Structure formats: C-alpha cells, structure tokens
Amino acid sequence: MSQIIDQVQAALQNIDKELEKYPALKELEKQIPVPKSYILLGFVGFYFILIFLNIGGIGQLLSNIAGLVIPGYYSLLALETPGKADDTQYLTYWVVFATLNVFEFWSKAILYWVPFYYLFKTAFLLYIGLPQYGGAELVYKAIVKPLAQKLVNIQPHGGPSDSLKAQAQSAVDAAESHVPQGHSTGVSH
C-alpha cells in the first residue's frame, strides 16, 4: 500500500512540475494553499461529475468541449510541425469526431436509453484525441474507412474513385448529347 501511495505522490509531483508553465495556476496556488495538481484533479473530477449527471443536457456540451479543446490544441501544434505523422493523426481524429457527431445527431432517441452515454463519449473522445493512444487511427481503420469505401467507393490510394469519375463523365456526356449544336453546357473537360 505504501508503494502505491509513493507512486501517486510522484505522479502528483510530476503534474505540479508540468503545471509550472501556467502563470494563472501558479497565482491560484498562491491565493489558496492547495497544490496545482490538486486544483487540476478537482476541476477534472467536477467536470466529469457534471457530464455524468447531465443536468439540463449539459453533458452533451461538456463532452463536445472536451472533444474540441484538447484535440484542437494538439491540431494547432501539429500544423506548426514539419512532419506529416501528427497531421495525419489529427486529420483522422476530426473525421472520426465528425462521423460520431453525425451518428449521434440522427440517433438521439436511441441514445436517450443508453445510461451515462456522454460520460462514455467523453472517455472515447479522449482516447481517440490524445496522441499517445492512437485511437483515432484504430477507429478509422476498423470502422470509418470500410464504411466510407462501401458507401462512397473510396479507393485505397485515397483519391477519388475511378468509377465515380467515370459516372460523372458519363453524366456530362449524356447532358451534352441533349444540347443542340452550337450551344454549350457550360461544363469544361
């Protein structure tokens, strides 16, 4: 038991060291004699309790804020780095996030019966949004990509499908065949 307490204390000290970067937290720590790590954990705990209770539907808002703020911050950082790996992580995240929100919009009646849905959604969004877990890529490859390939016929190389291009071209050709000589459809090849 003593070993667990020591590990928790070490983790809290590491959190305090990381939070030294934020002047507002340092000032708050001076005003109230509580370590920054305890303030952060208290805020996070209160945040999750509000999501859990979902009073007045606030769980949905707080869940979406968690799904926007943390990955949004990392996305802005990723835009400033020269590599592509982090860009791919967050582009994938936003595709999964949007897919989840569209699904959620159309299934409110079903979600009403799922207890603590927004608590689970928040945990899921953090799982797919935090880079150390790689959850967005996993969900994308397992669910979103196969669904997109089936519904939109996206080819593995990532570009528009050849059959979709062919269908669009045949629609243009069919339209042009019905236009009298000398008139233009306004569509350029």
Curated annotation (Swiss-Prot):
It is a multi-pass membrane protein. Belongs to the DP1 family. The short lumenal loops between transmembrane domains 1 and 2 and between transmembrane domains 3 and 4 may impart a wedge-like configuration, thus deforming membranes. Keywords: Endoplasmic reticulum, Golgi apparatus, Membrane, Transmembrane, Transmembrane helix. Oligomer. It holds the Pfam family TB2_DP1_HVA22. This is Protein YOP1. GO terms for molecular function: membrane bending activity. The gene is YOP1.
